[in-house]
């Protein structure tokens, strides 16, 4: 994949240092990178990675605000990430892959708030085995997450959407949970380590 501005080559590496260098050299801006992410998300829209996704326009507005803010003490300035949908993000429903459980939190969880304070940009909430009780990525009413390598194989779970959002380079990193392999298994099965 290569965008018209050639940003795809930078983002393919998905290396935070490369992205920071591209920001420093004015080759890339946070809104550019967010657009790249959404192009990848739209390209892979058949995959059941996302439960709730910020509107592109909203994410770009956040990226524009980040762009004009100081980078001092913000090691994740302009870096997009996703969050497993059992962790609260202000403005996005938390479902734990159970629609009847759905609620809108009043504020983001401390980990999400800390990442945003460090300059990171949350794009949305990812699919998981319902209530994070599974290790294969197939126990969600929002659809089955499949392997990044072959859609006839499972992705692993329960942090399946988190691992796939990174493996498919839709975001640079993701926050998941792990009690008995829920993060490690899908990360290993999809080379998201």
Positions of predicted regions on the chain:
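Mobile "lid/hinge" segments at catalytic clefts and subdomain interfaces of large enzymes
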Residues: 189-192
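Single conserved hydrophobic/aromatic residue that forms the stacking wall/gate
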Residues: 1-11
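A ligand-binding cleft/hinge motif common to bilobed small-molecule-binding domains
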Residues: 183
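Gly/Ser-rich catalytic/binding loops embedded in alpha/beta enzyme cores
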Residues: 12-179
């Amino acid at each position: 994949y290569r965008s018209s501005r050639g940003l795809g080559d930078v983002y393919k590496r998905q290396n935070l240092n490369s992205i920071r260098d591209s920001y420093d050299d004015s080759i890339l801006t946070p809104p550019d990178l967010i657009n790249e992410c959404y192009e990848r998300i739209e390209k892979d829209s058949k995959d059941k990675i996302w439960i709730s996704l910020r509107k592109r326009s909203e994410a770009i507005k956040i990226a524009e605000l980040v762009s004009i803010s100081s980078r001092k003490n913000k090691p994740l300035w302009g870096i997009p990430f996703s969050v497993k949908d059992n962790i609260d993000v202000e403005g996005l429903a938390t479902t734990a892959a159970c629609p009847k459980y759905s609620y809108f939190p009043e504020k983001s969880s401390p980990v999400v708030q800390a990442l945003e304070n460090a300059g990171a940009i949350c794009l949305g909430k990812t699919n998981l085995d319902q209530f994070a009780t599974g290790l294969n990525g197939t126990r969600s009413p929002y659809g089955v997450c499949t392997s990044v390598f072959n859609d006839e194989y499972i992705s692993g779970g329960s942090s399946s959407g988190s691992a796939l959002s990174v493996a498919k380079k839709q975001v640079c990193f993701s926050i998941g949970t792990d009690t008995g392999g829920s993060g490690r298994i899908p990360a290993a099965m999809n080379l998201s380590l």
